[in-house]
């Protein structure tokens, strides 16, 4: 479930809901989890659908890249994305969770061809800040980010366990994103939420229940960066897809972009022709 809002009018803010998670922490659990060795992740990877028609990919891209499921200030049907390097900083005293998050960021960077994303050494150097909190501190953290009144509205309408929001400029370029994740709900859910929230903070903010293969479906849990969503993010971050584009403008360039994206996703995942 996703909420998009303008508050104040110059601020584009979207709040995404997902079932979130985190763990109790054994020394090498972060390495194991990020390597896809959790049984819940491994079983999903074995059963994953990896072959899609052009129309299946395009449908999912258009549904997730435009608009948002829940709005406070109307619909905005324009492409929103970062137009430069993305640097992520994690604020937490949980070294295991920070290690997992860094591996998630590295995985995203490996699989999205034209996205320059990496961890930052400080909050000041980051344009994506990830706050890792205990579940009992979530509402207080939301209040510190968005104010008590907005936090109550979020809790009443969405009852989130994790969320993210971004600020864009007048050209629909994302300037800054905030992600809030809880750390004490289990490994699988932590990774599931970390992937979805980080990816949605990059632009594809619309959850949809009509596309069964995407993690941007509230009925789907992944825990890893699946092939279908790699198509969506690679389409979004192709240089020919520009911030501020309308649906019609995107459709005009999609065929050529999709040809190149298919070749990249096939290569990086070692998929058969």
PLM regions and their residue ranges:
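Bacterial N-terminal signal peptides that target proteins for export
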Residues: 3-16
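Bacterial N-terminal signal peptides
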Residues: 14-25
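Metalloprotease/metallohydrolase-associated module, dominated by Zn2+-dependent proteases
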Residues: 44, 72, 151-189, 205-273
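Short hydrophobic beta-strand segments
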Residues: 83-95
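Metzincin-family zinc-dependent endopeptidase catalytic domain
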Residues: 99-195, 200-211
């Amino acid at each position: 479930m996703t909420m998009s809002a303008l508050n104040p009018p110059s601020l584009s803010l979207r709040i995404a809901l997902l079932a979130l998670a985190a763990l109790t922490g054994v020394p090498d659990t972060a390495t194991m989890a990020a390597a896809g060795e959790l049984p819940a992740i491994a079983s999903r990877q074995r059963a994953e659908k990896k072959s899609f028609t052009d129309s299946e990919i395009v449908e999912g891209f258009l549904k997730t890249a435009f608009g948002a499921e829940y709005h406070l200030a109307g619909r905005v049907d324009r492409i929103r994305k970062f137009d430069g390097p993305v640097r992520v900083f994690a604020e937490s005293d949980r070294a295991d969770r920070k290690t997992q998050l860094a591996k998630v960021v590295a995985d995203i960077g490996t699989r999205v061809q034209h996205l320059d994303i990496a961890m930052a050494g400080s909050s000041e150097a980051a344009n994506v800040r990830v706050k890792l909190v205990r579940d009992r501190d979530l509402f207080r953290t939301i209040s510190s980010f968005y104010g008590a009144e907005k936090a109550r509205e979020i809790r009443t309408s969405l009852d989130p366990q994790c969320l993210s929001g971004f600020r864009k400029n007048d050209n629909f370029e994302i300037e800054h994103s905030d992600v809030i994740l809880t750390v004490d709900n289990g490994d699988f859910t932590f990774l599931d939420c970390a992937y979805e929230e980080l990816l949605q903070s990059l632009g594809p903010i619309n959850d949809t229940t009509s596309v069964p293969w995407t993690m941007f479906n509230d009925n789907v849990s992944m825990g890893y960066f699946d092939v279908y969503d790699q198509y969506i993010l690679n389409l979004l971050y192709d240089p020919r897809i520009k911030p501020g584009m309308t649906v019609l403008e995107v459709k005009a360039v999609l065929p050529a972009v999709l040809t190149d994206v298919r070749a990249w996703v096939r290569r990086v995942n070692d998929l058969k022709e």
